[in-house]
C-alpha cells in the first residue's frame, strides 16, 4: 500500500548554491535543499542518488518517507564507506547506510519488483577498475512541480559536508536530455561493471 503524500509542493530552485560551514544560517543550505527535494518527490516518481558517503539522519528519514509515498529510491555509495573503522578490534558499520538499507528492504515487501528501492555499494569508481566513486549527484524525476531535476556538485549526503566543509551544488530543472544522461550514468555505476571509456560527457541545450 502507498501512504498518502505529504510532499511539499515546492519545486527545487534552479541554479548554484553554496554553503558556509562557519555561518550558522547558511552551513546547511545545500543539505537542506537536497532533503527538501526528497520530501517534495511525488508518488510514483524516482530518486537516484550517487554519494561517496552518506551519514545524515535527516536524509535517511526523508528517503524512507519518500518510499512510503510510493517513490522509488536508489542510493549508491562507495564501498569503503560502509565501515566507519574499528573499535576494540571490531569493525563498525555505517549506521546511516545500514538503517536506510534495512528500511527500504522492509518497505519493498508489497512493491512490484520494478519499483523496489534499495542501496548499493560499488568498488573503485563503479565504472572502472581503479579510483573511487567520488562523484555526487541527486536526480529526481519529479519533485513538487519540477520534472527532470538534476543536482550536481561537491556535497556528500553527510553532516560533515555542512559543518566542516565548503560545498556547492548546481541544480538544473526541466532538461529531459540531461536528466536521461545522468540516469544512464547512474545505471552504469549501479551495474558496477568496468566500462570502455573512463568518463562520460555530454552537451545539453536549453539549460536552466
Task: Specify the residue positions occupied by each region the protein language model found.
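HKD-type phospholipase D/PLD-like phosphodiesterase module
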Residues: 1-43, 53-208
Amino acid at each position: 500500500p502507498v501512504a498518502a503524500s505529504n510532499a511539499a509542493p515546492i519545486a527545487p530552485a534552479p541554479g548554484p548554491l553554496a554553503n558556509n560551514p562557519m555561518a550558522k544560517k547558511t552551513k546547511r543550505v545545500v543539505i537542506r535543499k537536497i532533503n527538501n527535494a526528497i520530501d517534495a518527490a511525488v508518488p510514483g516518481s524516482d530518486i537516484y542518488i550517487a554519494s561517496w558517503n552518506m551519514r545524515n539522519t535527516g536524509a535517511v528519514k526523508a528517503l524512507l518517507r519518500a518510499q512510503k509515498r510510493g517513490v522509488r529510491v536508489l542510493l549508491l555509495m562507495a564501498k569503503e564507506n560502509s565501515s566507519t573503522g574499528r573499535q576494540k578490534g571490531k569493525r563498525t558499520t555505517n549506521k546511516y547506510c545500514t538503517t536506510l538499507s534495512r528500511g527500504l528492504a522492509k518497505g519493498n515487501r508489497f512493491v512490484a519488483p520494478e519499483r523496489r528501492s534499495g542501496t548499493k555499494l560499488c568498488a573503485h569508481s563503479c565504472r572502472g577498475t581503479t579510483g573511487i566513486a567520488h562523484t555526487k549527484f541527486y536526480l529526481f524525476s519529479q519533485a513538487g512541480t519540477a520534472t527532470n531535476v538534476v543536482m550536481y556538485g561537491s556535497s556528500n549526503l553527510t553532516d560533515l559536508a555542512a559543518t566542516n566543509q565548503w560545498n556547492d551544488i548546481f541544480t538544473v530543472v526541466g532538461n529531459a536530455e540531461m536528466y536521461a544522461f545522468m540516469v544512464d550514468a547512474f545505471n552504469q555505476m549501479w551495474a558496477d561493471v568496468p566500462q570502455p571509456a573512463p568518463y562520460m560527457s555530454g552537451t545539453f541545450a536549453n539549460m536552466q
